[in-house]
């Protein structure tokens, strides 16, 4: 039996177990997905313990995404982002990947969004870093808007063809943008949005990384403006799909995994 899992603290809320288990069931794989909740200062030790126990792959979530960098051989993208959310133990040395970046790209691609032009990323935290690098690697120009403009500037200095801005620049940035991705947690608060509704337009594709609630105020406003909308569960799904395919070497049964994920939202 192959064993995969998730380390984080806490992990009780995670939707990864049912999503991955649905994939194993659909393909008839002899595999299980389990959760581990080590102490908040023991991320690196947890990676070493998992390797000793013969775990085949791990997802990594808060607060360990940065802590485990020194315990794995990070892939180039994960190293640039400065965070690991997937570990593969099957190659002899634990290798760390960041599938959040790919998750955003594949979520947009699933909705037939053209990955070209200019993208505005709201938020310069962990999710914002991953999405900014992921979109830049697809060839988009990236405009990073953050409440603290200096943090947006610092991230833009690392990302190819990027610039940093304050949130007060959003309306101007979005006027000629093709893609908007919200990487802040603002949408989790009822009726809150980080983006002025009148800045949205029908030529935009809008992805909100928030998936609780599934239809945020931002997505409601975007739909009203005629924009293409992509909810955060698609990004969650595709970061998991990317890990699933890397671990198993199989094409993920995306529809089954998506169905199970949405049952648990």
From Swiss-Prot:
It is an enzyme of class 1 (oxidoreductase). Its EC number is 1.1.1.25. InterPro entries: Aminoacid_DH-like_N_sf, NAD(P)-bd_dom_sf, SDH_C, Shikimate_DH, Shikimate_DH-bd_N, Shikimate_DH_fam, Shikm_DH/Glu-tRNA_Rdtase. GO terms for biological process: amino acid biosynthetic process; aromatic amino acid family biosynthetic process; chorismate biosynthetic process; shikimate metabolic process. Pathway: Metabolic intermediate biosynthesis; chorismate biosynthesis; chorismate from D-erythrose 4-phosphate and phosphoenolpyruvate: step 4/7. It catalyses: shikimate + NADP(+) = 3-dehydroshikimate + NADPH + H(+). GO terms for molecular function: NADP binding; shikimate 3-dehydrogenase (NADP+) activity. NADP(+) binds at residues 123-127, 146-151, 209, 232. It comes from the Archaea. Shikimate binds at residues 14-16, 61, 85, 100, 211. Keywords: Amino-acid biosynthesis, Aromatic amino acid biosynthesis, NADP, Oxidoreductase. Signal peptide: none annotated. The active site is at 65 (proton acceptor). Homodimer. Belongs to the shikimate dehydrogenase family. PANTHER family: BIFUNCTIONAL 3-DEHYDROQUINATE DEHYDRATASE_SHIKIMATE DEHYDROGENASE, CHLOROPLASTIC, SHIKIMATE DEHYDROGENASE. Involved in the biosynthesis of the chorismate, which leads to the biosynthesis of aromatic amino acids. Catalyzes the reversible NADPH linked reduction of 3-dehydroshikimate (DHSA) to yield shikimate (SA). This is Shikimate dehydrogenase (NADP(+)).
């Amino acid at each position: 039996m192959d064993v995969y899992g998730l380390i984080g603290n806490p992990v009780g809320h995670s939707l990864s177990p049912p999503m991955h288990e649905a994939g194993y069931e659909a393909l008839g794989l002899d595999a299980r997905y389990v959760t581990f909740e080590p102490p908040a200062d023991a991320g690196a030790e947890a990676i070493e313990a998992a390797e000793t126990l013969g775990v085949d792959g791990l997802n990594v979530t808060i607060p360990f995404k940065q802590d485990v960098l020194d315990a794995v051989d990070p892939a180039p993208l994960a190293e640039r982002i400065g965070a690991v959310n997937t570990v593969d133990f099957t190659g002899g040395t634990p290798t760390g990947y960041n599938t959040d970046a790919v998750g955003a790209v594949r979520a947009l691609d699933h909705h037939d969004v053209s990955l070209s032009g200019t993208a505005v990323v709201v938020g310069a935290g962990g999710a914002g870093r991953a999405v900014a690098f992921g979109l830049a690697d697809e060839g988009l120009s990236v405009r990073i808007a953050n409440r603290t403009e200096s943090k947006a500037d610092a991230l833009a200095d690392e990302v190819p063809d990027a610039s940093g801005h304050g949130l007060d620049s959003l309306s101007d940035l979005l006027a000629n943008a093709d893609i908007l991705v919200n990487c802040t947690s603002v949408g989790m608060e009822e009726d809150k949005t980080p983006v002025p509704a009148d800045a949205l337009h029908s030529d935009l594709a809008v992805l909100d990384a928030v998936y609780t609630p599934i239809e945020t105020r931002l997505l409601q406003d975007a739909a009203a403006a005629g924009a293409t909308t992509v909810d955060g569960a698609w990004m969650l799904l595709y970061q998991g799909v990317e890990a699933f395919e890397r671990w198993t070497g199989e094409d993920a049964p995306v529809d089954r995994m998506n169905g199970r994920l949405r049952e648990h939202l």
